[in-house]
């Protein structure tokens, strides 16, 4: 089954009900939300989410297990200085996700900043273990990054090494096509790209795909998303991910730019699903 959707707005007054309604209007069957502003740890109380309205009207069209939550960008579980704040926040975030019944929490691995990468790697593994020990049900997904600055997890070997070191069935990977392209993985050479995903064992842990085009050339380490078919990756390569059996049943989530201050996810989903 093809699962495709996008980031949708989780905002007052309708929160979860409104987000899933927007997804269905886009002809999606999966969705991704932030539980607050992406650049903030501010959160409203779960009783404001309009969970019962969602359950009454949309539960069957997009069930909770097909709702993906993204952690805010500003936390850094790989930093020995910031890890405690990040970990405490994520434990509370997972409690809110359990209230919804969602399955996955996507997390940027963080930056090693002034520390060595090895120190940051050990801290990240420790953070993930601590968060999982204090929570239940939700699966943490580390996201593949572009390698901008001191970002962690910009290559497949590193992210798989970290995931395997955590040693938990509740840890996995979210692959972002823009990020991995910018990190140097050539999606235009699709057979080789799939071979690399298998060789590094990343496929064993892949639970969600962020499907984005890139404004930047291969290996640029920029992390600038483009609309589908408007970037350097191109529609043909991104469409292959939709239909290739290797990625069957994995939710594909669009995080592409707005056009004229409006999302065009409905158009992009239709474009991707159109067989040529």
UniProtKB/Swiss-Prot annotation:
UniProt xrefs under SMART domains: AP2Ec (SM00518)
SS bond partners: none
The protein's required cofactors: Zn(2+)
Binding residues annotated for Zn(2+) 1, in chain numbering: 70, 108, 143
Annotated Zn(2+) 3 binding sites: 179, 223, 225
Positions with a binding annotation for Zn(2+) 2: 143, 176, 210, 255
Xref: NCBIfam families: nfo, PRK01060.1-1
HAMAP family: Nfo (MF_00152)
Protein name per the record: Probable endonuclease 4
Lineage, broadest ranks: Bacteria, Bacillati, Mycoplasmatota, Mycoplasmoidales, Metamycoplasmataceae
Gene: nfo
């Amino acid at each position: 089954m093809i699962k495709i959707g996008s980031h949708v707005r989780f905002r007052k007054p309708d929160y979860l009900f409104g987000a899933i309604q927007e997804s269905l209007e886009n002809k999606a069957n999966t969705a991704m939300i932030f539980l607050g502003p992406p650049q903030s740890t501010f959160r409203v109380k779960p009783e404001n989410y309009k969970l019962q309205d969602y359950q009454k009207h949309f539960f069957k069209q997009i069930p909770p297990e097909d709702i993906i939550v993204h952690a805010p960008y500003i936390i850094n579980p790989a930093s020995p200085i910031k890890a405690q704040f990040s970990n405490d926040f994520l434990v509370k975030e997972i409690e809110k996700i359990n209230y919804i019944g969602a399955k996955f929490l996507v997390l940027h691995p963080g930056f090693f900043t002034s520390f060595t990468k090895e120190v940051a790697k050990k801290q990240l593994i420790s953070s993930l273990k601590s968060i999982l020990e204090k929570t239940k049900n939700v699966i943490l997904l580390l996201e593949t990054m572009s390698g901008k600055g001191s970002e962690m997890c910009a290559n497949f070997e590193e992210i798989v090494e970290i995931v395997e070191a955590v040693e938990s069935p509740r840890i996995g990977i979210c692959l972002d096509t823009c990020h991995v392209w910018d990190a140097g993985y050539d999606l235009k050479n699709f057979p080789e790209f799939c071979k690399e995903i298998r060789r590094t064992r990343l496929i064993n842990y892949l639970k969600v795909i962020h499907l984005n085009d890139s404004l930047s050339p291969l290996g640029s380490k920029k992390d600038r998303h483009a609309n589908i078919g408007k970037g350097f990756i191109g529609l043909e390569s991104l469409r292959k991910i939709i239909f290739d059996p290797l990625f069957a049943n994995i939710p594909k989530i669009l995080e592409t730019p707005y056009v004229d201050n409006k999302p065009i996810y409905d158009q992009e989903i239709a474009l991707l699903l159109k067989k040529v």
